Amino acid sequence: MKKYDVQKFELLSNEQIADGIFEKPPWKDGRGAEIAMMLGISLTTLIFGGVTSASMATFGKIQNEIGKRVGLHPYRRANLLDGFANAIVLVMPFLSVFVFIGTSLTEGYDMAEPLTVTQVGGSMFYSMMLFLVLLFSVVTGWGRQYEGENGEPLNRK
């Protein structure tokens, strides 16, 4: 059995992860940072099987660091974190724990056939529409505000 030296594994800090993201030009402005934030929280939520509390606790500090670097207002950062974590990734029928729980609760009734994971996932309209609205706001800049010197929201940086 192989033994691993734990000291050889170095964990990356939030700042180091943000540095890695900001090395590429597309992520250096408000829109690019928001797209990076969207992809990051969505991937993290997928990894956690739709458990948003764990994904937001894991990726939240990284997202906060990304948003700070481009000056996005904290409300915008928080709304994007919560919104994208609870959007389309929750209805992925092959990963979301909520879809599996929903289908298992429909089994065992003689009066109706049990629902499949695609039926439950496909009926979660709120999550799908939330994703589209947030994606529209990221791409167009709708609602994007930056943080002023005293923390006040500014429409332009």
Please name every model-derived segment.
Residues M1-Q16, M38, S42-L43, I47:
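Core transmembrane alpha-helical segments of multi-pass membrane transporters/permeases
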Residues I88-K157:
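Juxtamembrane and boundary regions of transmembrane helices in multi-pass small-molecule transporters
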Residues R31-T45, V70-V91, P114-L115, G121:
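Alpha-helical transmembrane segments of multi-pass membrane proteins
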Residues Q16-G20, T52-G67, F94-D110:
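Re-entrant/interfacial helical elements at transmembrane boundaries that shape
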Residues L11-E15, G32, T52, M56-F59, ...:
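Generic structural signal for well-ordered, non-membrane alpha-helical segments
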Residues K8-G32, N155-K157:
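Cytoplasmic juxtamembrane regions at transmembrane-helix boundaries
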Residues K24-I62, R69:
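Hydrophobic alpha-helical transmembrane segments of multi-pass integral membrane proteins
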